[in-house]
Amino acid sequence: FHDGSDEVPLFDRDGTRQLELNLIWLNKVCEFAKKHNKIPIFWDDMPLKHAGVYKPMFNDKISKKEVDDIWEKNEVSLMKFIEKFPKNAIYMRWNYQKSNTYGNQKAMDWYTENGLNVMGATAGQTRWTLMPQNQSNISQIKSFAVNSIEKKLEGLLLTLWDDDSPHFELYKRGIAAFGQFAWSGDKESIDEFKTIYRHRTYGSKFSNNEFAFIDKLENPVGLWLNMLLSKEGWRPGLSKKKDPIVTDIIELPDLNNKGLWSKKYSEKIKNANESLLISNEVEQIINYLLNNNSKNKYTLEVYNQVNELVKFSAKAILALEKLDISQTVDQIDYKKTSLKEIKDLQNEFDYLRINFEKTYSKTRILNKPDYYILDQDHHSHPANQTINFDWQFLSEILFLKKLKNLDNHEKL
């Protein structure tokens, strides 16, 4: 029985402190779960946060002595109410990026030393957009799995968060890694696991590093996130902005100030070139797999659509650079070519979106019903920003709208 009260704010009330209030609630839930023959599972944030020992779990820069000092000072707050900690619950010690910190290990040990059941919770997907990254978080999955085995804990949980809604096909390598290391511990290295994964997923002919396209794709996807945005732009919040085309979308070249845009956005241009180079390599690998009888073709098709979307943004930046530079070159044909590339972006995107939606819709419902209630609070979960599938392409859609306002095209 999963209780999700970890994000509920608490305030002191009638002389009762936050930690004690949280424990009162946990005990009520545990009594309810026991009556229904269920085992309650809690995220353990609140007790540790209210006691002041929370931050060291996520800080790998502080020394063991500093962590011990924090615990020596604040553990008394936990021990004051130790008898009120429910014994029939599992305390879920989540840590998705820093599971091997001394602070995290110390917190887990505290539970077991005080007769409480604790499990670790790692993640195959957190808040990455478009696809899981950090090599599917495999290093963290392995670290937490090995630590849990060494501590003889009863189990380990793999979370797969949908806050940013990548396609579920792209979660599968992280799930496989969790199975591998949770069941087998430290028997294989991460590189050995990746070889095994390629073998089992695509076929024995495709197990070597020549076909390791997933890790390659991570960098272009990371660059894609803000490729078409201004410095202040934020993709998840675009739908809530008053005028995102002005505030969040990258500015366009000023045709009266030749070359200025390219100088200002030299870093984006560099990133776009780098991204496109890698994406072209990824495209070749995926196409080879698709054309040579690999297994799990649908997974490859989804990765291919991710790569196509990433390529579009990089190409758009390079097209703007070409337009900006073409103003400094006395070649009419070159200018006409750069202008045509800009005008063709809308058609390229329309074609891309048709194929993207065709692939994703095989296993995903893209459009919500008209009565669906979108985000109304401070959260900005991408898929909850529009009724239709526009949320996946908001940066691209707004960028293309802005592009239509580019003045003086015909004067080139």
Please tell me what each predicted stretch does.
Residues 1-6:
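Aromatic-residue-lined binding/catalytic grooves and analogous aromatic/hydrophobic interfacial grooves
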